[in-house]
Amino acid sequence: MSLVIPEKFQHILRIMNTNIDGKRKVGIAMTAIKGVGRRYSNIVLKKADVDLTKRAGECTEEEVDKVVTIISNPLQYKVPNWFLNRQKDIIDGKYWQLTSSNLDSKLRDDLERLKKIRSHRGLRHYWGLRVRGQHTKTTGRRGRTVGVSKKK
C-alpha cells in the first residue's frame, strides 16, 4: 500500500451483505463474500476490467456495481459453467453461482431432501456421524471419555 491514502479511500466496503476490508488487495478482499473464492474473484475482476493490483478501498462505485452484477449473473458475462458452484441443480437443472444466504439455504434444503428420502448420506447427517466414508471407531468421539478402571 502506498504511503499516501487517496481521498476517496473506503476502509470498509459493503458488498452483498458482507463487510469487505478496504486495505486488502481487491482479489483477496472479495473472498470475504461467502461463495466467492480466489479463482472466482479473479475471473470476476477480469470480466469487470478492475485492476487486480489495487486495494479494495480504491475501487469506484461503478466498478463495485459492475462486480456485483457479474457475481450475481455470471452466465450473462460468459463465465464457463464448470466455474460455478452449483452445477445441474436437482430442481431445475440449471447452473448457478450461489453466494451468502442463498448458499446456506440451498445447502440446508439439500440436507433436508437427503434426510427426507432416507438416503445413506441423509441418515448419517441425521445421526451426526461422518458422511464421506471415514473410520469412526476411534476418532470423532464426543461426550464423556470412558477410561479403563485400574485393578487393585
Swiss-Prot record:
One Gene Ontology term from the biological process aspect of the record: cytoplasmic translation
GO cellular component, one term: nucleolus
Subcellular location(s) of the protein: Cytoplasm
Phosphoprotein among keywords: yes
Entry keywords, A to Z: Cytoplasm, Phosphoprotein, Ribonucleoprotein, Ribosomal protein, RNA-binding, rRNA-binding
Molecular function via GO: rRNA binding; structural constituent of ribosome
Ribosomal protein listed as a keyword: yes
Listed transmembrane segments: none
Modified residues (Phosphoserine): 41
Pfam families: Ribosomal_S13
Cross-referenced NCBIfam families: PRK04053.1
PANTHER family assigned: 30S RIBOSOMAL PROTEIN S13/40S RIBOSOMAL PROTEIN S18, SMALL RIBOSOMAL SUBUNIT PROTEIN US13
Cited function: Located at the top of the head of the 40S subunit, it contacts several helices of the 18S rRNA.
Similarity remark: Belongs to the universal ribosomal protein uS13 family.
Protein name: Small ribosomal subunit protein uS13
Species, as recorded: Drosophila melanogaster (Fruit fly)
Primary gene name: RpS18
